[in-house]
């Protein structure tokens, strides 16, 4: 059963001369235990759709629904904190925090005791291959692949049901890209998370459970 749905979603924005349709009539559903890739050319609307799914913006028309309820009717900040983790291409780690503190950050926001939060963060860092002697390092002391693993550990520590990733392997070499994709697959299949990934890498996209192709703001194909 779908945990997250887009129903007749339209998203527009205004330029000086015209109304631009970034998305038109988008219908799609996403399930727990499944990894979905959203693909399309630059400007096709795939990142806009991911932002709407994450509750970072609201559709101009139509609705995004989580367990049947429109996200527009929810306290979106509270809903995101409890249910959504977004993994970005540029990692979005805090430069002044250690790997452990970055991974624990969503638990700090949830008011979890510091010791408990950092114990959970340490467990998730270990799960994605970050070694204990790296826990105290700031992001600048980690490689790109290691920083992305910290970002994924942060998503794991948060306990989010929805893991949404925007080009998570875009800055990584082939080996690290495959490793990160494997971790995301394990999140979906072994931890029963709903994982949605925007990617331009068709080879990696074909390894997901489902591929949604967007063209000119519309869903052109699903496979």
Predicted regions, residues:
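The feature captures the beta-strand-to-loop junction immediately N-terminal to the Walker
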Residues: 39-41
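Helix-to-loop junction immediately C-terminal to a conserved catalytic motif
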Residues: 54
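Conserved ABC transporter NBD signature motif
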Residues: 62-70
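ABC ATPase NBD coupling module
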Residues: 71-85
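Conserved ABC ATPase "signature" region
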Residues: 115-133
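Conserved ABC ATPase signature
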Residues: 138-142, 146
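Conserved catalytic motifs of ABC-family nucleotide-binding domains
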Residues: 159
């Amino acid at each position: 059963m779908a945990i997250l749905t887009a129903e007749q979603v339209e998203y527009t924005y205004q330029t000086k001369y015209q109304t631009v349709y970034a998305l038109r009539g988008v219908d799609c559903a996403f399930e727990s235990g499944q990894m979905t890739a959203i693909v399309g050319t630059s400007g096709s609307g795939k990142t806009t759709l991911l932002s709407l799914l994450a509750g970072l913006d609201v559709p101009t028309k139509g609705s995004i629904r989580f367990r049947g309820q429109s996200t527009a009717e929810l306290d979106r900040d509270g809903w995101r904190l409890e249910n959504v983790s977004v993994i970005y291409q540029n990692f979005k780690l805090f430069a002044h925090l250690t790997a452990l503190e970055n991974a624990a950050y969503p638990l700090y926001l949830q008011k979890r005791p510091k010791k408990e939060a950092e114990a959970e963060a340490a467990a998730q860092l270990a799960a994605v291959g970050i070694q204990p002697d790296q826990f105290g390092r700031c992001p600048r002391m980690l490689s790109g692949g290691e920083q992305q693993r910290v970002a994924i550990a942060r998503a794991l520590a948060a306990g989010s049901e929805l893991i949404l990733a925007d080009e998570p392997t875009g800055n990584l070499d082939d080996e690290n890209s495959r490793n990160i994709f494997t971790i995301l697959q394990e999140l979906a299949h072994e931890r029963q998370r709903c994982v949605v990934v925007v990617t331009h890498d068709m080879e990696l996209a074909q390894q997901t459970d489902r591929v949604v192709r967007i063209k000119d703001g519309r869903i052109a194909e699903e496979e």
